[in-house]
């Protein structure tokens, strides 16, 4: 999910280590390379998906019957705490507003209508302020967090919500963009984007995947790669990701704010 071009080599190193761990545990066949030719949704729907990462909200809404959650990575990017992350609410650096409340009747841009970080968490932050009424002058969809930030920086939108791991990567990789932006507030927290596999993956392969993941996250030779990706550790305990995602949606409905507008 954070596979920026500059980070693909790092992701490939992690996958190579994970693939070796699976082969050592007699899992076959194991792809030699990561698949980058499919969209996120095509990947999540693929019956042969062995290992991937997913946004929690679309999993909860559309893909729960197709995917098994393997584990939750923990990140050390600003805005992350243990298994949880937040979205940064971002505006232009020269925007005079000091609080989210002051963005009322402004132009909002969201990456995707079913994004947890871009919509669901943002809606949770807005719901008590909106209290059932329209909050923004307009809401448009950009297709990606990166595109949303471009629109805000260019003055074509006033505010967006971007997950904190994406923002941390862009602050490293594209300071010429992020220097034109600032964080005005943070959303409520949600579990980090989980690692997933197809529901068709066997129990023995699930066990092997979790064991191989534990090895990848404890391998000292991979420490620089994990650091580059802000990966701190991995939580292999029973998952509560989708429950929290649904709680935030229910809370927004309680505030009579079911749709971000």
List each language-model region with its residue ranges.
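N-terminal hydrophobic or amphipathic helices and topogenic motifs
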Residues: 1-66, 71-75, 82-84, 221-261
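A ligand-binding cleft/hinge motif common to bilobed small-molecule-binding domains
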Residues: 50, 54-64, 128, 153, ...
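Short glycine/proline-rich, acidic loop/turn segments that cap or connect secondary-structure elements
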Residues: 210-226
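Solvent-exposed coil/turn segments that connect beta secondary-structure elements
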Residues: 54-57, 94, 113, 165, ...
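Bilobed "Venus flytrap"/periplasmic-binding protein-like clamshell domains
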Residues: 1-21, 82-148, 223-233, 239-242
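Periplasmic-binding protein-like
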Residues: 71-73, 79, 83-86, 175-211, ...
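Hydrophobic, well-ordered secondary-structure segments
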Residues: 120-133, 137, 141-153, 178-180, ...
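Hydrophobic residues within well-ordered alpha-helices
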Residues: 44, 103, 152-153
């Amino acid at each position: 999910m954070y596979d920026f071009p500059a980070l693909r080599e790092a992701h490939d190193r992690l996958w190579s280590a994970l693939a070796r761990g699976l082969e050592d545990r007699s899992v076959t066949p194991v792809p030699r390379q990561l698949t980058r030719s499919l969209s996120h949704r095509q990947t999540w729907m693929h019956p042969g998906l062995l290992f991937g990462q997913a946004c929690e909200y679309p999993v909860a809404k559309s893909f729960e019957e197709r995917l098994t959650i393997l584990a939750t990575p923990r990140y050390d990017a600003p805005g992350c705490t243990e298994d949880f992350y937040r979205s940064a609410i971002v505006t232009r650096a020269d925007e005079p507003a000091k609080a989210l409340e002051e963005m009322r009747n402004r132009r909002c841009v969201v990456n995707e209508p079913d994004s947890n970080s871009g919509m669901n968490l943002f809606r949770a932050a807005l719901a008590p302020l909106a209290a059932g009424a329209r909050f923004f002058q307009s809401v448009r969809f950009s297709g990606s967090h990166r595109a949303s930030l471009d629109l805000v920086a260019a003055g074509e939108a006033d505010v967006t919500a971007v997950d904190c791991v994406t923002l941390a990567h862009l602050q490293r990789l594209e300071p010429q963009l992020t220097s034109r932006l600032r964080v005005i507030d943070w959303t409520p927290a949600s579990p980090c984007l989980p690692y997933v596999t197809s529901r068709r993956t066997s129990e023995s392969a699930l066990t092997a995947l979790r064991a191989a993941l534990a090895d990848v996250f404890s391998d000292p030779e991979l420490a620089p790669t994990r650091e580059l990706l802000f990966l701190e550790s991995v939580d292999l305990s029973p998952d509560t990701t989708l429950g929290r995602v649904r709680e935030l949606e229910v809370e927004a409905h309680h505030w009579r704010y079911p749709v971000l507008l």
